[in-house]
Structure formats: structure tokens, C-alpha cells
Regions:
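C-terminal cap of metal-dependent C-N hydrolases
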Residues: 17, 382-440
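His/Asp/Glu-enriched, well-ordered alpha-helical/loop segment
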Residues: 256-263, 305-397, 401
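Divalent metal-coordination and catalytic microenvironments
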Residues: 29, 34, 61, 72, ...
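Active-site gating loops and adjacent loop-to-helix segments of metal-dependent hydrolytic enzymes
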Residues: 79-110, 156, 161-174, 233-263, ...
Length: 445
């Protein structure tokens, strides 16, 4: 049965290029069979034959943006946001490893649907996620993602050093590999390709070289993603140096174990040397920039301008529970403010709001090799979009608020970055399917 078309009306806003935002006041997009079929002024789109039978959402006091992309977060950690500790490694030991240890099938079955509902309420339509080390709860996370309608790349954490699991050390590697293989065979490419697998050796502190090499080989064998963490914290970097003295730096550990490449997503990457950045650029590896987490755990500030100038692909990420919330608008705001703060002590280029927004939409999609499918509101792309209530964002004191017909894209974007959040999300669509809707998201056209 062919699904009913959906049309979204509002200020159409996206960022197809890094320094370029594009806006259309009182515009509309039409979504048919999961893809955007038309974009333009509301008066033109509303006269199209398919628009007559469409479900219309939004109105002149709304904004329509592409689905947001979060390329690094941890499902079982979400209940443990905002737990203060002096730095990364003590925080992991005190809060996170115990939380993940207890995240078994029953807990995941109850919690994961809430997690994916929260992503949708925040306007996120694609997320790259870690589960815990347990195979059973990873299955439940995938099942919840499938039911939610959201796009997800998920991996079961692998760790054979300082593991919180119950296996004897000499049994961890073969068991973890076999569990990961089963998860790949069940879920990689499931739900019509909406779900993908990411082999997930946690980081070099908690993985032997043997495990990392085996993980890289498994990912190559099955064509999956790889996700891990890199250069987040100074104590972490020093620990890696002590564990792997045969390598000149942290990034070389991953290079030597075969983990780098265009399907590898590396969280944080704050304290990289020039030679390490060159390795990431030359391998096509992707950085997940986690500004809220980087500040919360006192890890540092990633040099945005340096990473961008070096041509390393990157996207933004919430990194819950290191980051305290799933809202990518709050992550964008922190990304901007952290670079402003950095500029007080060192000369640097502060990214524009358009650039920040781009790296959460089209730029992130391009980094993940999905730029032709996602990231903007162009016809032909998949129908991932978010409908926002501008009355909840722009304080006008009028009811209804005046239309934003005289506002440019460069005027509106800072308002969204600094004031949008889950409370302003009226509806979220993934592949043309409503994955979240406020009761007020009715036809205002």
C-alpha cells in the first residue's frame, strides 16, 4: 500500500555547503514514498496534484529543517547524565562501567524505546550509538531502533582489558568476536538498510592490540563501520603511551591495528598532533566532535578550524552521558560557544552558525558517505525532516506570532542554535514516516 504523502509548511532552512545557509519563508516540502518530491513556496507546492491528498503539517509560524545527525552517543549511559567527576577515567570507573554492567536484556528492553523516542523528540533522525558489552542488550537496542523508525548505526562494546564483564580474560576475545559476528549477521543492513552495525572496540586503554586487530578484520570482512574513541583526555593519552610503547602516538596504535579508514568514526580527537591529523585525513577517518562532553568532563576544546582546514571529515555528537543531553541544538550551541571561548586565549577562526548547522546535517551526512541521501531538503533526498515551532523559539509577545517573512537564513539560524530544543519540536520525520509528533502538530496551512 502506497503511504499517504506528507507536506511540511514553514520557513524552509538547510545548509548545503559549509558556509552557506539557504532559506525560504513560507515554503513547503512534499514527501512521497519516503522521499522529498518537491520544494518551493507554499502557494506553488499546495497546488501540486499530490499535495491535495497529502497530510499537511506546520504553517507560516513554523520552520522546517533537515533531520539532525548525532554521530556518537551511548545508549546505556543516558540515565547517568550530569554525574560530576574530575575527569574521564575516574568517571568511567565510578559511574559508567557499573551502569553498563547492569544493562542486560531486560533493562534494555524497557529503556531503549525511551532512548529512541528521546532522539526523535530532539529532531535526531540518524544516530551512531554504542550499546554495552552484552550481546542480549545489543539485540534489544537494535530492536528498539527498528521499531522507532530512526536510522541507527549501533555496536556492542568490545573490551578485553579492565572489562566489567564476567568472563575469564582468556575467553573474552573469542566470545566477543563471536557475539559481534552474530549481531552483524542479524542487524547490519536490516530494516531496508536503515540499521547498520559498527564494530566497537571501546578505546586503546581497554583493548589489547590483538582485540583491535581482530575487530578491524571483522569489520573489513563484513563491510561494517568501526567506532572508537581517540585522544579525549591527557591521562588517557599517557596511559595509551604506557600500554603501547612500540607506537609513537595514540593514532598510530589504531593505524597499526588496522582500525583507521573511511568507515571509522573516532570520538573526540581533541589533542591530536599534526602527524596524527595527517593520518586521519589520509585514511579518510571521521571525527565525532563532542563539545558538550568535552567541556563537561574537562577534557579540552577540539580545534575546529584546524580540523576543518586539514580536510578531516567530521560531524557533531551529543556523547551522552559525557554530554548531558541529546539535543543537537544544544550541542551546536556549545560547539559555537567553545570556539568563542578558545579565541580568548589563542588566535582561531570562529565557525559561523551556518557552518555549525552544516556539520550537524549535510556535513555529517557527507562524512558518513550519505550526502546524496540525507542532510538537506532537496527533492530526491530521503524524507528526513524536523518541523519546529518558531513561537517557542522567537520571543515576540504576540499570539499568533508574526510570520518570519523578512528574516534571512543567517538571521534565523542563530536563533535556532541558541534557543531551539525538544520543547520546540512539533514533528520529526525519518524517510517520510512520523517518528515523533506533538499533539499540536496539526494542519495550520
Amino acid at each position: 500500500m502506497t503511504p499517504r504523502p506528507i507536506a511540511l509548511r514553514g520557513y524552509i532552512l538547510d545548509a548545503p555547503a559549509r558556509q552557506s545557509a539557504r532559506g525560504l519563508a513560507d515554503g513547503a516540502i512534499l514527501i512521497e514514498n519516503g522521499r522529498i518530491s518537491a520544494r518551493g513556496p507554499f502557494q506553488e507546492i499546495s497546488r501540486l496534484p499530490a499535495a491535495a491528498g497529502a497530510e499537511w503539517l506546520g504553517g507560516p509560524h513554523c520552520a522546517v529543517v533537515p533531520g539532525l545527525i548525532d554521530i556518537h552517543a551511548h545508549i546505556p549511559q543516558y540515565p547517568f547524565v550530569a554525574r560530576i567527576e574530575e575527569s574521564l577515567l575516574p568517571w568511567l570507573k565510578r559511574y559508567i562501567f557499573p551502569a553498563e554492567r547492569n544493562f542486560r536484556a531486560a533493562e534494555a528492553r524497557e529503556f531503549a524505546p525511551f532512548f529512541f523516542d528521546s532522539l526523535a523528540r530532539n529532531g535526531t533522525t540518524l544516530a551512531v550509538l554504542y550499546a554495552a558489552i552484552h550481546e542480549d542488550s545489543a539485540h534489544e537496542c537494535f530492536a528498539a531502533a527498528e521499531a522507532s523508525g530512526i536510522r541507527a548505526i549501533i555496536g556492542k562494546v568490545m573490551m578485553d582489558r579492565h572489562s566489567y564483564g564476567d568472563l575469564e580474560p582468556d575467553k573474552i576475545l573469542p566470545v566477543s568476536l563471536e557475539q559481534t559476528r552474530r549481531l552483524i549477521e542479524r542487524w547490519h543492513g536490516a530494516a531496508g538498510g536503515r540499521l547498520e552495525y559498527a564494530v566497537a572496540p571501546r578505546f586503546a586503554v581497554s583493548c589489547s592490540a590483538e582485540m583491535m586487530r581482530a575487530a578491524a578484520g571483522l569489520a573489513r570482512e563484513h563491510g561494517t563501520w568501526i567506532q572508537t574513541h581517540l585522544s579525549e583526555n591527557h591521562l588517557e593519552i599517557q596511559t595509551v603511551r604506557e600500554l603501547f610503547p612500540e607506537f609513537p602516538d595514540y593514532t598510530s596504535v589504531y593505524e597499526g591495528c588496522g582500525l583507521l579508514g573511511p568507515k571509522t568514526i573516532l570520538g573526540h580527537c581533541i589533542h591530536l598532533s599534526g602527524s596524527e591529523r595527517a593520518k586521519l585525513r589520509d585514511s579518510g577517518s571521521i571525527i565525532a566532535h563532542c563539545p558538550t562532553s568535552n567541556l563537561f568532563l574537562r577534557s579540552g576544546i577540539m580545534p575546529w578550524d584546524t580540523i576543518a582546514n586539514d580536510g578531516i571529515p567530521f560531524g557533531l555528537a551529543s556523547d551522552v552521558a559525557g554530554g548531558p543531553e541529546l539535543s543537537m541544538w544544544r550541542v551546536m550551541r556549545c560547539a559555537l560557544e567553545s570556539q568563542i571561548a578558545r579565541s580568548f586565549t589563542a588566535p582561531c577562526r570562529i565557525p559561523s552558525p551556518a557552518e555549525i548547522f552544516h556539520q550537524s546535517t549535510q556535513g555529517a551526512a557527507e562524512a558518513l558517505g550519505k550526502g546524496s541521501q540525507l542532510g538537506t531538503l532537496d527533492p530526491g533526498k530521503e524524507g528526513d525532516a524536523v518541523l519546529l515551532d518558531l513561537a517557542a523559539i522567537i520571543p515576540s509577545g504576540k499570539n499568533p506570532p508574526p510570520p518570519e517573512s523578512n528574516m534571512s537564513a543567517d538571521d534565523l539560524l542563530p536563533l535556532l542554535i541558541h534557543r531551539a530544543g525538544p520543547e520546540s519540536t512539533l514533528a520529526t520525520l525519518a524517510a517520510g514516516r512520523k517518528v515523533y509528533a506533538q499533539p499540536s502538530a496539526h494542519n495550520n496551512s
